[in-house]
Amino acid sequence: MEKREPALERTTEPKEHYAYLINILLEAHSAGDLPEVEGIIVEPDYGYIANIRYKTGEHRIVYGHDPGLNHGSSEELVKDKGYTKFILRQHGINCPRGDEFLLPWWADTLRSSDRQKYNDFIQDTSQAQGYIDQEMTYPVYVKPSRGSQGVGVTKVHTPDELAETLESFDEERVKVALVEEGLQMPDYRLLVFDGELVNAYERQPLSITGDGLHTIEELVNTRHTQLLEQGRDIHMERQRPLIEKRLGRYGLQLCDIAALDQRIQLLDISNLSAGGTPKDIMDTIHPRWAELAREISSIFNLRVCGVDLACKDISISDSDYSVIEVNATPGAKQFMATGEGEQDRLKRLFIRFFEQPQ
């Protein structure tokens, strides 16, 4: 059989519209930091996928911000917040109290299927209010069971808000809603690679500080501009309805002038993709929490693993805690955009991702 020579783009240059992880890959290869990589093919129109060929003849696929290190079944499982928490609880790991409820259209679809028509355990969103009455009190968080970057995560305070949120989920064809207790603890992201804690930071929700001169809306727009200038890809228009709802809870409107030094939290979520601010904690995190993150990465067989952790005091070992989510493709673009030190640290980590075929 004739041996074909691979047609690899050995001199592909980074481009602004390429996925940030692929640009880092290309920069590292061009700089000679990946001596085992023979060549890289990048789909040029969108720059969202890449094929790496190593000198051993092995290949690796990069898909968006997924470096191609984790097993597909593990990645699929942790995309589902309900399944993830089932596994965590079986291992004695604390998670927020909560349960899953199928949206009516999806519940009807399953109940009519050949296999699930015998399942008596299917519960739909008509049962969510009764569950809250029995198990917890408002406010609660309602979120799509599958999703990322905090999209759709809503803090609800009343039965009417619950009904409104679930109705919007139904319109968006969300299949499963997760209802969870609200936690009054700081929120952290811990990143593990091959059993090593390589990054850890506190996530603080998007907020502004008043100057006594400008309206809240003007300050929000200024903050948005600052984030964009930092390279943060923040879609503020998607957050605006949630900002208005949170302000309304405290008797505020976007047109109000924020008092001098008045700090106003704008969102109930702290995701960096929603404008949250990271605070590095690598020097203060207690080893107990690094060990917990490593244990979770092992449970799910994830070489790259992001653990979202609520913890009362991350500097001590016996603090109250709860694991909020596990991520198999924890994007770090937002953290990298916050400073040169963070960029250098994460770039070195990403180079490690690509050094060897597996």
Predicted regions: what they are:
Residues 44-46, 102-103, 204, 311:
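Conserved beta-strand edge residues that scaffold enzyme active sites
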Residues 63-64, 74-236, 287-290:
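Active-site nucleotide/adenylate-binding loops and adjacent lid/helix of ATP-dependent enzymes
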Residues 247, 274-291, 297-304, 311-358:
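C-terminal active-site "lid" helix and adjoining low-complexity regulatory extension at the edge
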Residues 1-90, 107-110:
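ATP-binding N-terminal substructure of ATP-dependent carboxylate-amine bond-forming enzymes
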Residues 50-60, 189-193, 197-199, 315-334:
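A short beta-strand motif that forms the metal-chelation/ATP-contact edge
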Residues 34-38, 94, 196, 303:
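Residue-level detector of anion-binding/catalytic polar loops
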Residues 2-12, 64-67, 146-149, 255-278:
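A short, surface-exposed helix-loop junction/capping segment
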Residues 218-265:
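Oxyanion-binding "anion nests"
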